[in-house]
């Protein structure tokens, strides 16, 4: 099968660029978007498509720094924004005593700014409060926090929230104790409203955290407004409108939100940011595809292999069993063949996404990649999609990533 342009379709342009770091890539992208607009392209005719929500959030932050009006399409990308993440974290803490990562994030965030020494003391106190826990030598903070979130048995898992409510003789500074008291008081006040309808509770949390006032000062409350609307209209499968149902949906959107929500960009004159999944059926004059690097796009297989992961539902029991690979032979050869079939299925799925991404631009497609980003120990290589785009465009070759 060969793809051909439609009859009468104007010529398009493909640009291919590569950068040493993700920061350099995003700086260039934001500068180029601004330049395109200055040359006459409306903001609404520009889109940035990414494979992952974390990249989407980084693009949003960089465009905002350049005063570019921008809209994130889809709830998954909103959840990592600095005005949304504390709301979701607070909602989880209100319902889950083992939401240790969220408690730690809130306490060390801009609002409470608990010091690392105080957090380490709190983590040790959390271990002390576990029934039957024997005293241990203090661990480095990173190991303390890792242990807090890694225990599989809830009955023996430490709870930072328990330690916040009962710090005992923990070596916490006076200022830290004062902040923890205000933190617990705020949570207690919010818990008194857990029986409210979920949208009202969400608004109450936003108000209590002072986020709406903060965004008013910055001149943009649109993302908060969109989050509130999403929380008011989420697909309530259980029909009880519970906070637990909302949080389960938000978790699913962030982790597996490939198509849980239909993309509906507004008509506002703003650059549209969305994951490739949500771009199906949409087109823009200019489309940017950043981070076409190995491990990003194509992404790694998140569906997993049920034969090696007991947490996954066996493929024969899934509702889409007829449309996915099945393990036909339980011998080693059969299991190896099944594993390879899963890899091929994942590759085909990523190829479909790449097709969607590459065909969203009416006139200009800008493809870029990077080698380094925070947290990497080895440089990323160029993805095969980047190489495919480079083959369509005469560009300066990207040097191989450094060893």
Q: Whereabouts are the PLM-identified features?
A:
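Well-ordered alpha-helical segments embedded in enzymatic catalytic cores
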Residues: 25-35, 55, 86, 352-353
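Acidic, low-complexity intrinsically disordered tails
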Residues: 402-403
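Conserved beta-strand scaffold positions in the cores of enzyme catalytic domains, especially
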Residues: 13-16, 70-72, 273
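Inter-lobe coupling/hinge region of RecA-like P-loop helicase motors
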Residues: 1-49, 103-104, 146, 158-171, ...
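Glycine-rich loop motifs involved in handling phospho/adenylate chemistry
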Residues: 75-82
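Conserved helicase C-terminal RecA-like lobe
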Residues: 42-43, 53-68, 81, 88-364, ...
């Amino acid at each position: 099968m060969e793809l051909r342009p439609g009859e009468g379709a104007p010529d398009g342009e493909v640009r291919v660029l590569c950068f040493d770091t993700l920061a350099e890539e995003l700086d260039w992208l934001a500068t180029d978007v601004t330049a395109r607009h200055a040359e006459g392209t409306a903001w609404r005719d520009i889109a940035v498509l990414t494979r992952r929500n974390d990249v989407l959030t980084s693009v949003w932050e960089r465009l905002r720094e350049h005063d570019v009006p921008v809209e994130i399409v889809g709830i998954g990308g909103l959840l990592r924004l600095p005005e949304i993440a504390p709301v979701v974290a607070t909602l989880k803490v209100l319902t889950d005593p083992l939401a240790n990562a969220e408690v730690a994030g809130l306490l060390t965030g801009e609002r409470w700014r608990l010091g690392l020494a105080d957090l380490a003391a709190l983590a040790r106190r959390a271990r002390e409060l576990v029934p039957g826990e024997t005293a241990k030598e203090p661990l480095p903070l990173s190991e303390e926090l890792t242990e807090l979130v890694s225990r599989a048995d809830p009955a023996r898992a430490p709870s930072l929230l328990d330690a916040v409510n009962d710090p005992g003789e923990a070596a916490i500074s006076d200022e830290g104790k004062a902040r923890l008291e205000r933190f617990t008081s705020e949570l207690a006040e919010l818990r008194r409203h857990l029986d409210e309808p979920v949208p009202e509770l969400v608004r109450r949390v936003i108000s209590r955290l002072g986020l709406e006032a903060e965004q008013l000062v910055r001149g943009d409350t649109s993302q908060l407004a969109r989050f509130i609307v999403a929380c008011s209209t989420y697909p309530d499968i259980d029909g009880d409108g519970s906070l637990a149902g909302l949080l389960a949906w938000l978790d699913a959107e962030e982790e597996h939100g490939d198509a849980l929500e239909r993309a509906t960009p507004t008509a506002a004159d703003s650059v549209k940011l969305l994951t490739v999944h949500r771009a199906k059926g949409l087109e823009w004059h200019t489309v940017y595809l950043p981070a076409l690097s190995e491990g990003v796009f194509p992404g790694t297989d998140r569906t997993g292999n049920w034969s090696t992961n007991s947490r996954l539902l066996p493929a024969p029991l899934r509702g889409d069993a007829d449309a996915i690979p099945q393990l036909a032979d339980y011998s080693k050869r059969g299991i190896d063949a099944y594993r390879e079939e899963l890899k091929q299925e994942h590759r085909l799925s990523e190829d479909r996404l790449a097709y969607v991404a590459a065909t969203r631009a009416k006139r200009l497609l800008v493809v870029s990649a990077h080698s380094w980003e925070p947290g990497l120990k080895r440089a990323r290589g160029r993805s095969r999609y980047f190489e495919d785009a480079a083959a369509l465009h005469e560009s300066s070759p990207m040097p191989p990533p450094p060893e």
